[in-house]
Amino acid sequence: MWCDGAKALAIIRRAERATWENPDMSTYWAMIATLLCVAGGCSRQGPPGPELATSATIKDLMDAMVDPSAEYLFENIVEIVDEKGIIDKTPKTDDEWKEVRRRALMLVEAPNLLVAPGRKVAQPGDKAEYPEVELGPEQIQKLIDDDRDAFVRRARRLQDAAVLALKAIDARDKAELFSKLGDVDKACESCHLHYWYPNDTRAREAAKEDGVVD
């Protein structure tokens, strides 16, 4: 049986003293000490803990994290052209850049939460807000469960786009940020078209024109 860490340490100390007294045994004791260090380390490792609970639903995370962060970025990383000229709404101060970065970081990490095992689409009893064009939570859940790998790939597409947007923010490269936020928008719309409103023909045609889907 493996000894615990404290016993292993005591034996290692005795091995060190024995090595001083008999240098010819140094290699032997070094091997023993190494094995005991490994054993001691292993004995301190407890069993894996329980999985974390997933109380929030995908809808909860979309409402609390993804939608507000994406909308903030789309509304504040923009140049508006009207009859008066160009209105630049991009960040200018350090505080504005920090807020933009905070929102982008939400989009980087949200996909990790969305794909967590056991995460449900919505709370029991939730209904589609516009059932004439939207799928219900049960239908969306079935689409995800039937091909979970595809759901993970779509979430990763959002994450990858958000990571590049975050890099542009850190570089304060506005042109690159405009471009990468376009990719974020496409990733969002692609996922929505597949799971949320796949039967909305007008949205799908618009998405094809914008290069969101083939």
Regions found by a protein language model. Name each.
Residues 26-33:
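Sec-dependent signal peptide recognition
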Residues 43-101, 105-108, 112-214:
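Sequence context surrounding c-type heme c attachment/ligation sites in exported
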Residues 39-41:
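C-terminal motif of bacterial Sec signal peptides marking the signal peptidase cleavage site
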